[in-house]
Amino acid sequence: MSWRSESIWIELRTGSRKTSNFFWAFILFLGSLGFLLVGTSSYLGRNVISLFPSQQIIFFPQGIVMSFYGIAGLFISCYLWCTILWNVGSGYDLFDRKEGIVRIFRWGFPGKSRRIFLRFLMKDIQSIRIEVKEGISARRVLYMEIRGQGAIPLIRTDENFTTREIEQKAAELAYFLRVPIEVF
């Protein structure tokens, strides 16, 4: 989502609160809970859940491995739910032509650098760079090249934009900032 006027452009960035992240965190939680319950059932020698008999699974080595996978899956699921809760990666890009300043804000993980805030002068922007890699794992990234700072990604790699959409966004941003476009 974005908002534009003649001198200001604000681009809101979605973080980890995407439908796919909710889906995978939920599926991973259910799957790992199932593995842990089957491993626990094989250790106790009786069914904790009645969906399938776990007496056929002996504790050593299958029950131990299933318990380990269940615990590992619960930790990964907990990590995913925490990133969703904290909305890691969300924020905004603000381009202000009147003041000549670019502000980039993102939420990070809790701690010292929870708030990631970058500020640049517009005159330090060298170009808008598009990196397109086609193939099985297609990658389309939009960067802002800053003098003395290097390239700063503006669009995440997991946002599934087509090449045309990336080019359109790069052209609009380059026109707004009055800088050239580089394609890699």
From Swiss-Prot:
| Biological process annotations from GO | photosynthesis
Q: Where are the transmembrane segments?
A: 22-42, 57-77
Tell me where it mainly resides.
plastid
Which superkingdom heads the taxonomic lineage of this protein's source? Eukaryota
The entry's cellular-component GO terms read: chloroplast thylakoid membrane; photosystem I
What keywords would UniProt list here? Answer: Chloroplast, Membrane, Photosynthesis, Plastid, Thylakoid, Transmembrane, Transmembrane helix
What this chain does, per the entry, is described as: Seems to be required for the assembly of the photosystem I complex.
Family recorded in the similarity comment: Belongs to the Ycf4 family.
What's the protein called, per UniProt?
Photosystem I assembly protein Ycf4
Question: Gene that codes for this?
Answer: ycf4
